[in-house]
């Protein structure tokens, strides 16, 4: 992968296989040039199909598709450049999939009531972006759904949420990891709150940091964390914070 990013800031990269399993996670240092150059080993364990590469820097995310063993995309991915939006702002929703293909793009509220719907069509390289006006959207969690008779994908986002969640509890699905492993965390906090999730190495350096949100029941989960492939052994820390409220979980990398 080649491209550009903000200079002098680390870039988080994850790769999902056709079964939506994260098979690779890396932290890529970006120097003053802002240039991205990334390679990963392609082994026989990789199955044929369409893979999803997600790059995150600060709270901005970009997604791209690539194929192994086939020449065409056989899935759709919908994503937003970030997860949390101010009230009365605008959200850019991107759809990736087979080239020159029509999809219905729906915006649904938490009760699956349709707030907005339109038809979009991918361009010759399989992408399109639509700007949704969030004026009049009440505070809460929403879903962007891209679909046609063959494919469907969903991305959640929030509008008008604030920090300060009250008590936070969460856990990771396991406590022992190796370099390149994906981390899934699941937890609870105050309803409709923004959380900052951080991964901290044994030297106290923050390796990854991003925002997520709780739903109206106060639950949250994310698989956007991962151990860098060249990670040092030792005790790492996962931290969830919302305003003055915070919770830490210790994991071991070996």
Annotated model-derived regions:
Residues 1-254:
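Ser/Thr-rich low-complexity repeats and stalk/linker segments
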